């Protein structure tokens, strides 16, 4: 299939967490669909010739690569064969044994991590024990199965249209987009149908808020911050994959609104002007407190403060698609990061714990944490973003120092076995998909560091337009 190459614009370059209650926002009733036999021809693959993916340079950066490859080793061996039994299934499409989060989300996370290693040319069969050819075959088989079993291709019996399926679909879509040149025609068709279907759901979606403009709490204990962030991801995936789709502008408009609203604070609606074409005056509420903290699961929840990366990772996806990155993707990231590092929340303590002025890997949870107290990957990725996006200008200890302290702990945790498995005890992280969660955080960390190291980075606050064909 012939694809159209686009001029690669430099771009400035990042978790979704476990279940929040489904949004009351209204989904689109009648989006424009182009589900015809030629829908896949609208996809433009990344311009890898201009991107020139290659290994990161630098000792610390190579450590990031090593962690991702260890996660790949676990994914392709103990996870794929022993946990999932996929190697024992001989039908063309894998049977996931269900269509809910527990069956779909883990696979979506793993294919994103694997596709990143494969396409960025860092995959190493010496580390994983699986040849590149077999790793590619397994990854594509999982991608094609995710797409095939989606409602867009199976009707009511498929997965999708769920509380967080936008995130799962976006990671499957992006993995397929990375490996587009290696997909067969059927997988391309079903992948684009899945992507279009999930994106179209949000065209007329009513953006939800935790607090309205009068200060009334609409959803007590349940910020819509991370929900708006992860829902934006499928719209961005659709935009970069299908730059000439008739719904491109509608997808874009909703993606910008969701990203701007995700971590909006009280009073942001009074800011002058607009961000990427979305007027601040159209914000209908807020999802974070004025001090940058987030209330979710009925507590002040640091984990959901880092979920801003659901929006911020979009900045890198736009970049890979040859577009400038919108500032909306990072809106209020500096406010949230400063709260994590320096805000005194209880008994004179900060959520990020230092020792004699030095960064550590320890977190303080002022009201507890229902996911366990030994999570590192989300804070590590947040620290990388703070460094790359300059969110840490007012932090007493800088993002790169926090990231290095956490990475040391992460490498030690991963080194406890020879399988690449990260967690050894459930109480380290009670989230069921914790290993898969690690995989996609490491992949995004690698992508972001690589894009910055190669200076493929530029932000804009202007309205976005599709990339221009050569």
Protein language model features and the residues they cover:
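Bacterial N-terminal signal peptides
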Residues: 5-15
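Long, compositionally biased, intrinsically disordered segments
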Residues: 30-40, 45-46, 53-67, 92, ...
